[in-house]
Amino acid sequence: MIRAFDALSLPVLRWLDPEDAHRLAIQGLRFLPPVKPRADDPKLAVRAFGLNFPNPIGMAAGFDKSAEVPDALLRLGFGFVEIGSVTPKPQSGNPRPRLFRLERDEAVINRMGFNNDGADVALRRLAARAQHGGIVGVNVGANKDSPDRVGDYVKLIEAFAPVASYFTINVSSPNTPGLRNLQEGALLDDLLARVIDARERVRQKAGDTPVLLKIAPDLSLAQLDDVVQVARSRRVDGMIVSNTTIARPSTLREEMRAKEQGGLSGRPLFRLSTRMVAETYVRVEGAFPLVGVGGVDSGGAALTKIRAGASLIQLYSSLVYKGLGLVEEIKRDLTSTLLRTGRDSLSDIVGADAATLTAEDWPGM
């Protein structure tokens, strides 16, 4: 059924302006029949951050910015969904056009700028679906014009703790000026200290909601050392590696589109983001799990990301080119790999190639 839907919808959506196509996809999912998803093979189950994931495939933040369709996405077979980025106040984001397809590269450039309906609207939607179950994380960000960006994160933690399965602290978007500075040592330490304190203040009414940190792929290894050290010292529950890149690989074929400002995602990000997963994995030393993001467009790519050190993976841009059927395809491929190799679970292979990957030459961009 999903494959038939993809066959009909993908040509139409790709003909439309990218942002109009995205809006149409959201509207279509709002009317998705409430069908029960196919049960996942138990071998795909993952335990991470104190949560039980039915499978390791998540919808990355950026697709459902304001919590309009998390349950529809779960019914399509995702093991978890991350909504956002949400900011305290609504904001329209950067001027259009701000979303670009690089068709021949199977890539996307965006400079959206945290456009979303604001915390009140997203909170109301998540509260209304609380009884539905499923893992729905909340990616939190700061308003562009905020005089206290760290305070924005604190407000969101306190507000969403009762309805969030986990939080992602997004300090790595390249589309809000100055935001990536919060990845730097003392600033990051202050941010995480205040976020964890906020989580502790609402623990009694909301439980121990996991806090994850999402980082950029453009960090130097020295910067990564500092980020991991701070994350470990502040006892975050995990990291998401990685956000979009501001780099432009020399191999990009859509040369004119590649000049657009913003974050690059999709297939060209795969090698860099996977290397960053491996580099992070060896530095974390098992202190917490990782979520791998960037260029996952097949079962083989998902497996590579897991072997680099990711316990879970997320995708988004690849759906633009492969359709929603990609989720079930990846799950089938992962299950087949486990059966063929006699493994009982994906945890048996997490990080198996990390040492090898970190010894290789740095992937060219």
UniProtKB/Swiss-Prot annotation:
EC number(s) given by UniProt: 1.3.5.2
Cofactor: FMN
Pfam family, one: DHO_dh
Keywords, comma-separated and alphabetical: Cell membrane, Flavoprotein, FMN, Membrane, Oxidoreductase, Pyrimidine biosynthesis
Keyword Oxidoreductase: yes
Gene Ontology biological process terms, A to Z: 'de novo' pyrimidine nucleobase biosynthetic process; 'de novo' UMP biosynthetic process; pyrimidine ribonucleotide biosynthetic process
Catalytic site positions: S173 (nucleophile)
Membrane-topology annotation of the record: Peripheral membrane protein
Source organism, top-level taxon: Bacteria
Location in or out of the cell: Cell membrane
Class of enzymatic activity (EC top level): oxidoreductase
Binding site for FMN: A61, G62, F63, D64, K65, S85, N139, N170, K214, S242, G266, G295, Y316, S317
Pathway linked to the protein: Pyrimidine metabolism; UMP biosynthesis via de novo pathway; orotate from (S)-dihydroorotate (quinone route): step 1/1
GO MF, any single term: dihydroorotate dehydrogenase activity
Listed GO CC annotations: cytoplasm; plasma membrane
PROSITE patterns linked to this entry: DHODEHASE_1, DHODEHASE_2
Function: Catalyzes the conversion of dihydroorotate to orotate with quinone as electron acceptor.
HAMAP family, sorted: DHO_dh_type2 (MF_00225)
Subunit structure: Monomer.
Record protein name field: Dihydroorotate dehydrogenase (quinone)
Organism annotation: Bradyrhizobium diazoefficiens (strain JCM 10833 / BCRC 13528 / IAM 13628 / NBRC 14792 / USDA 110)
Lineage start: Bacteria, Pseudomonadati, Pseudomonadota, Alphaproteobacteria, Hyphomicrobiales
